[in-house]
């Protein structure tokens, strides 16, 4: 096995009406907290921690997440992913997710913060069987600079592939290189600083849901730009441009709340972060 800076493996299964950890293993700069259950629900919730506090030059990370039949998992992080300067090699993170029949994964990580002169590459591959559901988000901020400048990182590269029954149904590649792109120009970020992406794949998705989401979002006085797009298979993608993490999260929360109530009769998730 490759010697990663941080490695995490989590396999879950449904047993006696609750989702439990069938197998859990981690080492290095990754750690999993013990699961908890919101409102005594069957869905297991886990926090991923990075005890090191941030990602540095040449770090490599890998997560392998597996949900057995009818398992339900909410996976989040304890804090933002801080990418410090990388003078030689980029930070690389691989995320591999497998969802078996009838399972549900809500993957809600904190924002990515690229510090000045940092480089980060993330590759996410999701394999879904029929009847599974995925809700996954990513937030990219304008980064951190000691002088307060925006977009002073070298590169943020996020590549996501989702397969349903071994067929590629979504390929999303975001590559931001401020040195060669004018990210504040027309057609880019313009006056905004944060980019949010929510991916939802589920056979429960239909056009009436998209219309409902648009209707609700239009009443919320959101201070952002957003767009919803249907996928080739039942599912959608939400893109958000905003000026803060909080505004991106407001848009995400509206969609997430409606989906949880409509599909699973569950109350909204409040993780107490933003």
From Swiss-Prot:
It is found in: Cytoplasm. GO terms for molecular function: nickel cation binding. Keywords: Chaperone, Cytoplasm, Nickel insertion. GO terms for cellular component: cytoplasm. It comes from the Bacteria. Pfam families: UreD (PF01774). Belongs to the UreD family. UreD, UreF and UreG form a complex that acts as a GTP-hydrolysis-dependent molecular chaperone, activating the urease apoprotein by helping to assemble the nickel containing metallocenter of UreC. The UreE protein probably delivers the nickel. Required for maturation of urease via the functional incorporation of the urease nickel metallocenter. This is Urease accessory protein UreD. It comes from Lachnoclostridium phytofermentans (strain ATCC 700394 / DSM 18823 / ISDg). The lineage of its organism: Bacteria, Bacillati, Bacillota, Clostridia, Lachnospirales. The gene is ureD.
